[in-house]
Amino acid sequence: MLPDAKLDILLARHAALEAELLGQLNAEAYVRATRELAELTPVVDAVKAYRAGASELSDLDAMIDDPTTDAEMRAMAESERPVLQERQENLEQQIRIALLPKDAMDERNVVLEVRAGTGGDEASLFAGDLFRMYERFAALQGWKVEVISASEGTVGGYKEIVAQVQGRGAFAKLKFESGVHRVQRVPDTEASGRIHTSAATVAVLPEAEEIDIDIKDTDLRIETMRAQGAGGQHVNKTESAIRITHIPTGIVVMMQDSRSQHKNRASAMNILRSRILDAERQRAASERSADRRGQVGSGDRSERVRTYNFPQGRVTDHRINLTLYKLPQVIAGEALNELIDALTTEHQAALLATETSA
């Protein structure tokens, strides 16, 4: 049974927003109210349909139980009841999911970090493949991707690449991508046709805002230096590169992609805030670990999450034991949503189980 009090609050909030939008609002308040109304409308429609269905179901039961109902009408009611019951159960599940506690970071932009792991040059190439997969996936969502820093591999791909993904709900979609991604394929340089296994690590951080993290100047050690090229040689004469160390956590960010020290510092601080925020989220999650059994992945960067097997054309997500024989479509970003949707569904099921047992 759904909690009527919660549903009444939801309906009241929806009505209040509709009334608010009929009044005089400034631009910021109008955007906020419109966005919240758009989020609430689908679940409010489901609640109204659910309540109408409950009334209809009650009428059918009364008709079936009434001894004066003629045989034809009773037979019709009995045939309609299972269909209506199934629709009610689907609506109830939809509403329960909508009422689950929301991750406050789900609507945030993302700082995406992809790093080559074990496997040498092949790992760098795979890191490049992964980044392009996310880049194309983001484009399909209508999001914007901006590279913040990149260290290219010797034969292509990336040793490390950091980018900002800007778009509504970016973190909600991408947060389950964090972890170790493994690839199995025959490198172009492998004459014997032997399959090599390489890995890359993906970190998806919700972009922090200044109000999220209070960073004192005294907690920072800031060093400037001349930017260096791939071979270690200095590529400009000014000290535009910057390295910032957050002393309490030991988190270090170095930025040198821009010729402007000011831009490098701003980018480094943005990443630093996001990493500190992520570290705090990870710590809080580990403290709740006893309550998180069965949820999708731990978010641990060392957790192996997915294997891409090129010879067999398959992708396996180890957290939910899902295998898709759509590797070209996944790596092109086109079928990545199938994995993300399955992970989200599993996560929601785990949350529902926790809520039910609470």
Swiss-Prot record:
Span list, region Disordered: 282-308
InterPro entries noted in UniProt: PCRF, Pep_chain_release_fac_I, Pep_chain_release_fac_I_sf, Prokaryotic/Mito_RF, RF-1
SUPFAM superfamilies documented for this protein: Release factor (SSF75620)
Domain of life of the organism encoding this protein: Bacteria
Sites bearing N5-methylglutamine, chain numbering: 233
Keywords in alphabetical order: Cytoplasm, Methylation, Protein biosynthesis
Alphabetized GO MF terms: translation release factor activity, codon specific
Subcellular location(s) of the protein: Cytoplasm
SMART domains: PCRF
Stretches with biased composition (Basic and acidic residues): 282-306
Any Pfam family the entry gives: RF-1
A GO CC annotation given for this chain: cytoplasm
PTM comment text: Methylated by PrmC. Methylation increases the termination efficiency of RF1.
Family classification: Belongs to the prokaryotic/mitochondrial release factor family.
Role summary: Peptide chain release factor 1 directs the termination of translation in response to the peptide chain termination codons UAG and UAA.
UniProt cross-references to NCBIfam families, sorted A to Z: prfA (TIGR00019), PRK00591.1 (NF001859)
UniProt name for this protein: Peptide chain release factor 1
Organism: Afipia carboxidovorans (strain ATCC 49405 / DSM 1227 / KCTC 32145 / OM5) (Oligotropha carboxidovorans)
